[in-house]
Amino acid sequence: MMKVLVVVALLVTLISYSSSEGIDDLEADELLSLMANEQTRKECIPKHHECTSNKHGCCRGNFFKYKCQCTTVVTQDGEQTERCFCGTPPHREAAELVVGFGKKIFG
């Protein structure tokens, strides 16, 4: 009976050790994923910078993600080109203003 208890205790110890190793591996994978997301965040395009070549790469603002806003520019030669920049659309800018004002009033 004593040998059976020792073997069971040994098996429980081995199983718990192997499962903790699996959890550590999982945490390492999550950490690598978070680091990749942080790298992507650093590569985003800030407000008022050009986003013509990457229209979905604008950074996040205080409350919303900036939108790539495009305009058509006519050069002196009469050639039309599209130029885009990251910015806050007017309706979202108004929402941020209202929320900021509400925070000042209500703390």
UniProtKB/Swiss-Prot annotation:
Disulfide bonds join C44-C59, C51-C68, C58-C86, C70-C84. Expressed by the venom gland. Keywords: Disulfide bond, Knottin, Secreted, Signal, Toxin. InterPro entries: Spider_toxin_CSTX_knottin (IPR019553), Spider_toxin_CSTX_Knottin_CS (IPR011142). It is found in: Secreted. Residues 1-20 form the signal peptide. Residues 21-41 form a propeptide. GO terms for cellular component: extracellular region. GO terms for molecular function: toxin activity. Belongs to the neurotoxin 19 (CSTX) family. 04 (U1-Lctx) subfamily. The presence of a 'disulfide through disulfide knot' structurally defines this protein as a knottin. This is U1-lycotoxin-Ls1o.
